[in-house]
Amino acid sequence: MISFLLCLAILIGGYFVYGKIVDNTFGPDDRETPAVRINDGVDYVVMPQWKLFLVQLLNIAGLGPIFGALQGALWGPVVFLWITFGTIFAGGVHDYFSGMMSERNDGGSIAEITGKYLGPVMQNVMRVFSVVLLIMVGTVFAVGPAGLIVTLCKNSGMSGVLTTTLFWLIIILVYYFIATFISIDAVIGKIYPIFGICLIIMAVGVIFGIFTNPAYTIPEIWQHFGSMHPSGTPIWSFMFITVACGAISGFHSTQSPLMARCMKSEKQGHFVFYGAMVCEGIIALIWAAAGCSLYEITGGLNTGLAAALAEGQSAAIYDVCSKTMGGVGIALAMIGVVVCPITSGDTAFRSARLTLADWFKIDQDSYANRLKLCIPVLGVGAFLGIGNALGFINYTVIWRYFSWTNQTLAMIVLWAASMYLFQEKKNYWITAVPATFMSAVSSTYFILAPECLGSLLNSKTAEGATIYNTAVAYPVGVIFAIAMLVLFLHATKKRTAKNA
């Protein structure tokens, strides 16, 4: 428990100390923000700071810090360290700069920002990459909740159309269309703060339940400083990829511009962007602690948690909430596993619309122009979702690549932020260091993961267990990270010479 409390204190302190260093490095000022200057009543709408924070939290969180943290807890309390320091030095920095760079560039989408600082080739790569990723995220966060609602209806004794996935999927997609089309403060700005509060209450309830029940003990890092993963999966770099939103996530960079278009002052960025990421880190820390403390440990391995997750991630959330909070926890769990994915799905589609609008220079202040983009974006999402529900499309294999693409996106955004800081003659090491680190994480995972090159390089034991080829992956990951840093420094020298 001491480890947990120390990490919690470091996270909170990190917001006030390192978060302020990050904020001062960027240098917010009193210039007119896009929300005030453009204010189209649709995407550029001034919102109060507390609402900006809660909407940003729900946009970037959803179920990410819950699912990812529970999966990360399979490695044991060592995951506390990554959640804590990853949030402070990588995730918070990433979210802050993706939001503030957007704010300085008329609320532009992350693809446009990346192109400005890393060049037109990377801009086009990011445009395609972002739209595909966002539609995929939105679709998955429609199919998943639809299936969960069907399960709830069946368990409640209902029958007929209410117990069909297709019915609920259509309902969710209709809501997505409305939320993507109308003004951001009409639906998202009104209901998101409520669900953001629910997400926080659920996390507080979980940790309170653990603290007040003597049967549960949060293990200490120094007692289990190593992998407790039942399958023997290496900590590096699988844990760093798996935790994802609980420490750093490239998906956040697609969401931060939404709030960058709604800020009244640049000085709100520290609280809205860095603060929301720290809050998400705290939520992830709590759920990781739950995963480490509520389940049986056999032979120093988290076998109990592995069994719980094998029943399904939603089932694991339900189990944690019921054990720590009883009936109230069950109600909160249902809100969490159904509503939170939906609130990530609708903003994913909205971000896809805005990315396309920035790409093709289509103003979004008229209904007709929004329809031009909403129809194809939601149309593709509906095709994938309904196709999956009817069984003739299966993108499960494609979704496995999300973990890697998510952190690769974070890596690219951090390099873009580094170039921005260089051009502004500011301390670019504050972003270049985490960019280098994430370059190593992403490249190492690409070589080791079975869905990537691991299927070619790894081997199996006689019992079928995977032997990961770390002898190749680890050095290659380090070399790639160093190469990226060298390329960045070379680019800065070329730009310096050009401007001389």
Model-assigned labels for residue ranges:
Residues 123-127, 162-170, 275-284, 292, ...:
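Loop-to-transmembrane helix boundary motifs in multi-pass membrane proteins
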Residues 7-17, 130, 134-138, 196-214, ...:
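Selective recognition of specific alpha-helical transmembrane segments in multi-pass small-molecule
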Residues 138-156, 167-168, 180, 199-226, ...:
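Hydrophobic alpha-helical segments and their helix-loop junctions in multi-pass secondary transporters
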Residues 99, 210-221, 275-319, 389-393:
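Extracellular/periplasmic helix-exit of transmembrane alpha-helices
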Residues 10-11, 15, 56, 90-106, ...:
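Helix-loop-helix module between adjacent transmembrane segments
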Residues 10-66, 268:
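Membrane-interface "cap" regions at the ends of multi-pass membrane proteins
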Residues 1-19, 72-102, 111, 330, ...:
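Extracellular loop-to-transmembrane helix junctions
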Residues 47-64, 207-215, 224-287, 332-344:
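Hydrophobic, membrane-embedded alpha-helices of multi-pass small-molecule transporters
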